[in-house]
């Protein structure tokens, strides 16, 4: 975590840490350390995809994660990201539940097709609002480039490994108003275990 903090501080980068509940329960001191410097948001309790759950199960999962994080940090949790960006067009009800639970900022919209979900019809490339059944919630979507009519996501996770660096740099520089990138702690862990003989695959 110290390496992540150092990089954020040296680059003067704002960050929200979306924390999984069971990890917070296992490492509460790390969560308190994060909360002393940055916003802590919910990443659910058990990292289950939204569309795999009923409304009731999703509400219970997120509610328990919020309560746990608030108990650990002493701060109100108002930010959320769905595991795998798994709020699809058909799961708009999730925003209604999040709003009911006190979430005011979401970062779950993946404005392209995605293995775990995605909202290809979402057209805003900058922070905007999502609406469902009369509720409005601030949305910070994943950044994309429009190429040949398709939304191409590039600013996070495995995309940092798949997209050539020159292209990453070019597209990043072409986002002067808003750039949201996401990483997992393991992405910066030089000691992350590697699969044997992976280089030969």
Predicted regions located by residue number:
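N-terminal regions that are enriched for targeting/export leaders
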Residues: 1-6
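Surface-exposed, active-site-proximal loop segments in enzymatic domains
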Residues: 46-57, 152-156, 194-200
